[in-house]
Every structure is written in structure tokens, then in C-alpha cells.
From Swiss-Prot:
Keyword Secreted: yes
One Pfam family linked to the record: Flagellin_N
Predominant subcellular localization, coarse grouping: secreted
Keywords on record: Bacterial flagellum, Secreted
Gene that encodes the chain: fljO
Assembly, per entry: In C.crescentus, the flagellar filament is composed of multiple flagellins of 29 kDa; 27 kDa and 25 kDa.
Family: Belongs to the bacterial flagellin family.
Function as written in the Swiss-Prot or TrEMBL entry: Flagellin is the subunit protein which polymerizes to form the filaments of bacterial flagella.
Entry keyword annotation includes Secreted: yes
Any single Gene Ontology cellular-component annotation: bacterial-type flagellum
A GO molecular-function descriptor: structural molecule activity
Protein name, entry field: Flagellin FljO
Amino acid sequence: MALNSINTNSGALIALQNLNTTSSELNNVQQRISTGKKIGSAKDNGAIWATAKNQSATANSINAVKDSLQRGQSTIDVALAAGDTITDLLGKMKEKALAASDTSLSTASFNALKADFDSLRDQVTKAATNAKFNGVSIADGTTTKLSFLANSDGSAFTVTAKTLTLGGLGLTTTSSFTTAAAAKTMIGTIDTALQTATNKLASLGTSSTGLDTHLTFVGKLQDSLDAGVGNLMDADLAKESARLQSLQTKQQLGVQALSIANSSSSAILSLFR
């Protein structure tokens, strides 16, 4: 190949190729800086892009898991609140039964205590029946267990229902007394109901703690997945900024090199003047 040719300027061609390469790299860096992503699409790195997309899908699906677990929390919280009310009512029922067991009471006083007892009993039914969250209850005896999403694979966190109705506590809608002796017997019955209620509430409390712990774990898992996706996809902006400055300088030098290479043709022409 001729060293000096007006038909083919090899120096200019090489300079142009280098400038095009630099410009392409510069465009890529500018895109990474503007988007904040080092992997913008499958064409950038198919394997990493696919992995990141799968991880991102898993992280996003955990939102449904968290929603389900939070419903579980609320359902248990409502049952625990109802249970707290019910144990208070049972305590008051015991108080009325104990007072009514006093054989020295007048008939009017006894009847007043019985009426109070019956009213408190009926309030237990109302508290248990209304212990619903979003129409669902684990305290009214309508279900034996409830399952909530535990992970993105569809596995379940199961909570065993605890019936806090009169029947679930060993009482009936007609539990009462008509004599002082019957009132004395009722004291023991209420004590048993109280023990049953507190045992069931303790069990629900354990379930609530377990659900809270799992919800915390799921939240941390989602954060870890999001961080992993970020590590795979996000650009190092400090590094890209330094790279941008370097390529901009390289581009300017490339333009100068191309200008110098193009001037060689003019130099050859001057030889013939």
C-alpha cells in the first residue's frame, strides 16, 4: 500500500474507526448515567438481565404475601381484643354469681344480680360474634383454621381458630342461676370458662407472635432481593462519571487525530504546486 495516497487515506480511516468506537462507548456510558442502569435490556447481558428479572418478580410477589400476613395480623388482633372483652365480662359474671350466692339477700337484690349476670352473658355472645376482620373471624366458631400466604411459592402460614363463644367456653345461651346454691355452683363454671378463655387467648398470642416474626422475615427477604437486583442492574455512577470524562477527552483527541489524518491529502497536493 502506498504510504502517501489521495485515493485511500489509511490514517484517516483508522482515526475514524477509533473515533466511532469511542463515540459508541461514550453513548453507552451516557445511557447508563441517565438511566442509572448498567443492564438496560437483554442485549446488554442476557444472563444477568434474566436473573435480575426473575429476582425482581419474586420480590414484587412478596407484596401479596405481606398483604396476606397483615390481614392475618389484623384478624388475630380483633380476636384478641374480643377475648380481652370476654374475659372482663366473665370476671364480672363471676362477681355477680358470687354476690348472688349470699343466702341473706332479699329476693329483689337476688333478681337484680341475676339480671345483670344474664346481660353480661349475652354480651359475651355479641363480643364473639362481632370479632371479625374483613368478614372473617377465628373467634366465632365458624371456622377451625385460617391460612395466609407465607412465601412467594404459595406456601401457607396456618392459624388455628379459637372459639370464644359461650359454647366454646363451656357455657350456653341459657347459663344462669335461680337460687343462691345454683349461683354458688355457677362460680366454678365461670372459673372454668375463664381458664378456657385465657388458654385460648394465650395460644392466639403465640400465633400472633409467630406471624409477626414471619412478616418481619418476609420484609427482610424482599429487601435482600431488591438489593440483589440493584447489584446486578444498577450502574456505579461514580465509576461511570469518571469513565465519561475519560471518553470525552478521548473523543476530543480522536477528532484532532482525524483532522490531522485528513490534512495529509492537502500536504500531498502541495507537492505538485
